[in-house]
Swiss-Prot record:
Pfam families: Orbi_VP5. VP5 protein is one of the two proteins (with VP2) which constitute the virus particle outer capsid. Acts as a membrane permeabilization protein that mediates release of viral particles from endosomal compartments into the cytoplasm. Permeabilization activity is probably negatively regulated by VP2 and is triggered by endosomal degradation of VP2 and exposure to low pH. Keywords: Capsid protein, Outer capsid protein, Viral penetration into host cytoplasm, Viral penetration via permeabilization of host membrane, Virion, Virus entry into host cell. Belongs to the orbivirus VP5 family. GO terms for biological process: symbiont entry into host cell via permeabilization of host membrane. Residues 1-42 are annotated as: Involved in membrane permeabilization. It comes from the Viruses. It comes from Bluetongue virus 10 (isolate USA) (BTV 10). The gene is Segment-6. The keyword Cytoplasm does not apply. GO terms for cellular component: viral outer capsid. This is Outer capsid protein VP5. It is found in: Virion. GO terms for molecular function: structural molecule activity.
Length: 526
């Protein structure tokens, strides 16, 4: 269990502070007294913001815009018309989620119509039965199948799809890790197809990169969702190449409504089981290798990262199948005896026993302090049910403080065995507000508002799904806490933009670009 409380770094904080830190040492060691006099006269005791500070630092310290402005790119490709929502705006998030759901449903239906025969041959006719149960015509009462049997079929089919995706990822990763001469014919073909997709993705990212401005956090946008999914999908389960409708594991699950059937019959919400359409590490790698080929080992790392996300989903569905369904069956039988219900139907009371509170579902839950809400907000990030972990990430942008803490696990109907360690969300939240109250940088008004906020529960502003693994999410959170350079890039612009950038850095990660400047050469030609 860990806890970190740290001051946030911004561009334009007092340069006096900067000159007493590592920067000052570099001034004396790198350039000498002449440059030192120049720096002191130019900077004085004033505050230098943004790009000017960046330029002066780069002259003094020899860093490529040194400890300052570079190109910061969000490790996510946004589809046309998509934008990162403000975490404190539930309406903005809700609208985006609904539009995305409708688009995905339409695209998944195309996959079912196009590949139905191949999919049912590969994964069994149960998929069709599950789809008909949800969307098909009403049958005679005698022909209606037992609901519990249908639930088991949906869970088994979903597990089959995830296992197939996991094994294909493993084959591709193994092929990429082998020497080219040692690959089999199938592996050569697989690697060649994957390389073609990466090249297409690389050229699309390159076009976007050329048009980027230097001084803000950037998003790679403009690819249509169909092309993006086809280009970034490592191993399509059915269909190959750059087809516009590729039968990925995610698309097959959506097309046959497996999660919806499981939710409708058992009350178990599996909407958190997702994998990134495009693995963030592949974007980071592509941005690094601008004018050269990406080595096979780097591609293998990205494939293995995606495989980890798929394996997490496999473990989650196995947890539901082995731990939860037997309990479900037992409670179902008890309810039948009490209520005298017929065998074929699952009573709604059974489903309600497996509902869990919204704030404990595996998502990013967003809260704000009741007063000074624009500045003081925090995320409660909950892992998958089989891991049963969570962490707290709080920000006070008024006094530039960040607080990260691992929390104790929750008890609920879908969780794993409990371990008593760590603190609760309420305890972490109260300590976080105490920081703001006791900080020397807090104004009297801000401190009073935080005292009032501490006495009541924070405002719950809704939840968001995350596509990456919980481990990757936690690593992103810790990077936001530790990485001064990243903080400088996300804490710029209007307050709502800073919150968007923080959310983007948490959900996807950020790659900061910039090459080192040859300082002696720079000064010689100045």
């Amino acid at each position: 269990m860990g806890k970190i409380i740290k001051s946030l770094s911004r561009f334009g904080k007092k340069v006096g502070n900067a000159l007493t830190s590592n920067t000052a040492k570099k001034i004396y060691s790198t350039i000498g007294k002449a440059a030192e006099r120049f720096a002191e006269s130019e900077i004085g005791a004033a505050t230098i913001d943004g790009l000017v500070q960046g330029s002066v630092h780069s002259i003094i310290t020899g860093e490529s815009y040194g400890e300052s402005v570079k190109q910061a790119v969000l490790l996510n490709v946004l589809g046309t018309g998509e934008e990162l929502p403000d975490p404190l705006s539930p309406g903005e998030r809700g609208m985006q989620t609904k539009i995305k759901e409708l688009e995905d449903e339409q695209r998944n239906e195309l996959v079912r119509l196009k590949y139905n025969k191949e999919i049912t041959e590969k994964f069994g006719k149960e998929l069709g039965e599950v789809y008909d149960f949800m969307n098909g015509e009403a049958k005679e009462v005698e022909a209606v199948e037992e609901q519990y049997t249908m639930l088991c079929k949906a869970v088994d089919s979903y597990e089959k799809i995830l296992k197939e995706e996991d094994s294909k990822m493993a084959i591709l990763a193994r092929a990429l890790q082998r020497e080219a001469a040692e690959r089999s014919e199938d592996e050569i073909k697989m690697v060649k197809e994957y390389r073609q997709k990466i090249d297409a993705l690389k050229s699309a990212i390159e076009i976007e990169r050329d048009g980027m401005q230097e001084e803000a956090i950037q998003e790679i946008a403009g690819m249509t969702a169909d092309v993006l999914e086809a280009a970034s999908e490592e191993v399509p389960l059915i269909g190959a190449g750059m087809a516009t409708a590729v039968a990925t594991g995610r698309a097959i699950e959506g097309a046959y409504k497996l999660k919806k059937v499981i939710n409708a019959l058992s009350g178990i919400d599996l909407s958190h089981m997702r994998s990134p359409k495009i693995e963030p590490t592949i974007i980071a790698t592509t941005l690094e290798h601008r004018f050269k080929d990406i080595p096979d080992e780097q591609l293998a790392i990205s494939v293995l990262n995606k495989k980890t996300a798929v394996a997490d989903n496999c473990n989650e569905i196995a947890h539901i199948k082995q731990e939860i369904l037997p309990k479900f069956k037992q409670i179902m039988n008890e309810e039948k005896e009490i209520e005298g219900i017929e065998d074929k139907v699952i009573h709604p009371r059974v489903m309600m026993r497996f509902k869990i509170p919204r704030t404990q579902q595996p998502q990013i839950h967003i809260y704000a302090a009741p007063w000074d809400s624009d500045d003081v907000f925090f995320f409660h990030c909950v892992s998958y049910h089989h891991r049963n972990e969570s962490f707290f990430l709080g920000f006070d942008l008024g006094i530039d403080v960040v607080h990260f803490e691992d929390l104790t696990s929750h008890w609920h109907a879908l969780g794993m065995a409990q371990e008593a360690s760590g603190r609760t969300l309420t305890e972490a939240y109260r300590e976080f507000l105490n920081l703001s109250i006791s900080s020397t940088f807090s104004s009297a008004i801000h401190a009073r508002r935080m005292i009032r906020s501490r006495a009541v529960h924070p405002i719950f502003l809704g939840s968001m799904h995350y596509d990456i693994t919980y481990e990757a999410l936690k690593n992103n959170a810790q990077r936001i806490v530790y990485d001064d350079e990243l903080q400088m890039h996300i804490l710029r612009g209007p307050l709502h933009f800073q919150r968007r950038a923080i959310l983007g850095a948490l959900k996807f990660g950020v790659k900061i670009l910039g090459d080192k400047i040859d300082v002696p050469l720079f000064l010689r030609n100045a």
